[in-house]
Amino acid sequence: MARSSSVRADASPFVPDSRALADLTAAVQACTACPLYIDTTQAVFGKGSAKPRLILVGEQPGDVEDRRGLPFVGPAGRVLWECVEAAGIDRNGLYATNAVKHFKHENRGKRRLHKKPAADEIEACHPWLDSELEAMPKVNIVALGATAARSVLGKPVSISAERRAPLKLGERTVFVTYHPSAVLRADDRAAEVRAALVADLAAAWAASRRPRSVKAGGG
């Protein structure tokens, strides 16, 4: 059952000891650490290579992702994969996930409109992201947007200030850039934001070319 609002929500009790991605994907469906699981179809875990060259972290699943159970399959996802292709990146070398695993939204008639996760919701869900990163040690990360950057780095981040300066996180390098939804919201700046996202993805991919010793996770 959901935690009382007087107690800080924490997904840690729901995360299994295993770092096998299949085990984590199954376990996340039982998570009720925060109220975001209410009125959603399912939790949406990461998808992609278990031994990637690069990890992409977004904010949260959207309406389409919640219904299909896969990350980045809605309008913003289409933009992301177009940018990945434009950057010359082999999609088979990627693992894509989100900082928050349930779709936060408000109902407007028959529509479900995205709502930005609050800081305590990002923190509550962080053990799930941590478990994914532990399954893929040393792999560089692209944080797509402010929510992803906050979850990965553990602090608020200005995208405009940090996107040209890769940050070290242990043995990883973190590249901060725009979320693909920013392209959809940019109106007359859409081409500029898209070009910046493509350039940042290409730079992250180029910096992650050397083969890494990566374990896929185990018991």
Predicted regions mapped to residue ranges:
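A polyanion-binding, active-site-adjacent surface
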Residues: A2-G219
